[in-house]
Swiss-Prot record:
SMART domains: GuKc
UniProt similarity note: Belongs to the guanylate kinase family.
Subcellular locations according to the entry: Cytoplasm
Name listed for the protein in its UniProt record: Guanylate kinase
Organism for this UniProt entry: Staphylococcus haemolyticus (strain JCSC1435)
Domain Guanylate kinase-like: 6-185
GO molecular function: ATP binding; guanylate kinase activity
Binding site for ATP: G13, P14, S15, G16, V17, G18, K19, G20
Amino acid sequence: MDNEKGLLIVLSGPSGVGKGTVRKEIFDDPTTSYKYSVSMTTRNMREGEVDGVDYFFKTKEEFEALIQEDQFIEYAEYVGNYYGTPVQYVKDTMAAGHDVFLEIEVEGAKQVRKKFPDALFIFLAPPSLDHLKERLVGRGTESDEKIQSRVNEARKEVEMMNLYDYVVVNDEVHLAKERIQSIVEAEHLKRERVEAIYRKMLLEAKK
């Protein structure tokens, strides 16, 4: 089974739903074998974040230059900031047989779906929009106006749930993590993926 190509795992959901917290919980687990593809952004670094670990932080000018060079799988402008996924790392890592984990915005996930239709798309949903607003207020990093803008955007994003393969409600971080890991494990056992590997093995055996 060494010939299996890596799976592209795409986790997205509304701002404030806890994508980063769930992703950290997954990668703090020593049994996790996924490779994390660090996204790039022009937003300000938050307290506790590390450049090159949580995001690659760039200026708007630097980001736009990379767009012109076609260096992104996807990118989107969200609440005045750019977010994007550098392309080469993802392709190389999957080709080497490793699963690649993306934590991106909903608009970006739509672009990835077009380029990687076989990827695994997971929507991380809040228990409710009120709960989401409480999380955003609790951050203490944005104005009331910006928080309301994010909540309004979240309403639209929840309506786009049908673009995803699975929905995981982030009611408890450790439960969300376990649900995502179970989904990925099941995806590797899908008949289409396993059948393709065995067909390749049978062809090689005939040589």
